[in-house]
């Protein structure tokens, strides 16, 4: 009986360790994304006369524009 309890406890501890590691990794990735540009020296002077460069984006980045395939005007192989 005590052997089964120790197996259950070991399983629960390993599950807890795995979940805490996953949370730590996701938080680290989130912090890396949000602080990527704040430590940059280009972003340090907010009162510059020049407009902000692409290195210091404001807000969320735009999603990439969808690429549309160019259709051919050829009639070859299209039937009668």
From Swiss-Prot:
Tissue: Mostly expressed in leaves, and, to a lower extent, in seedlings shoots, roots, stems, siliques, seeds and flowers.
Expression induction: Induced by salt stress and salicylic acid (SA), but repressed by jasmonate (MeJA), mainly in shoots.
GO annotation, biological process: response to jasmonic acid; response to salicylic acid; response to salt stress
Signal sequence range: 1-28
Chain intervals with Polar residues compositional bias: 71-80
GO molecular function: LRR domain binding; receptor serine/threonine kinase binding
Keywords assigned: Apoplast, Cell membrane, Cleavage on pair of basic residues, Endoplasmic reticulum, Golgi apparatus, Membrane, Repeat, Secreted, Signal
Subcellular location: Cell membrane; Secreted, Extracellular space, Apoplast; Endoplasmic reticulum; Golgi apparatus
GO cellular component: apoplast; endoplasmic reticulum; Golgi apparatus; plasma membrane
Motif, SCOOP motif 1: chain positions: 32-46
Motif extent (SxS motif essential for MIK2 binding): 38-40, 72-74
Ranges spanned by the short sequence motif SCOOP motif 2, renumbered to the chain: 66-80
Function: Brassicaceae-specific phytocytokine (plant endogenous peptide released into the apoplast) perceived by MIK2 in a BAK1/SERK3 and SERK4 coreceptors-dependent manner, that modulates various physiological and antimicrobial processes including growth prevention and reactive oxygen species (ROS) response regulation. Inhibits root growth.
Family designation: Belongs to the serine rich endogenous peptide (SCOOP) phytocytokine family.
Self-association and partners: Interacts with MIK2 (via extracellular leucine-rich repeat domain); this interaction triggers the formation of complex between MIK2 and the BAK1/SERK3 and SERK4 coreceptors, and subsequent BAK1 activation by phosphorylation.
Identification of the protein by name: Serine rich endogenous peptide 15
């Amino acid at each position: 009986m005590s052997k089964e309890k120790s197996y259950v406890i070991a399983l629960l501890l390993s599950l807890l360790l795995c979940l805490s590691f996953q949370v730590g990794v996701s938080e680290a990735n989130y912090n890396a994304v949000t602080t990527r540009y704040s430590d940059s020296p280009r972003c340090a002077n907010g009162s510059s006369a020049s407009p902000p460069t692409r290195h210091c984006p404001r807000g969320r980045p735009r999603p990439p524009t969808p690429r549309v395939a160019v259709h051919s005007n050829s009639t070859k192989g299209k039937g009668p």
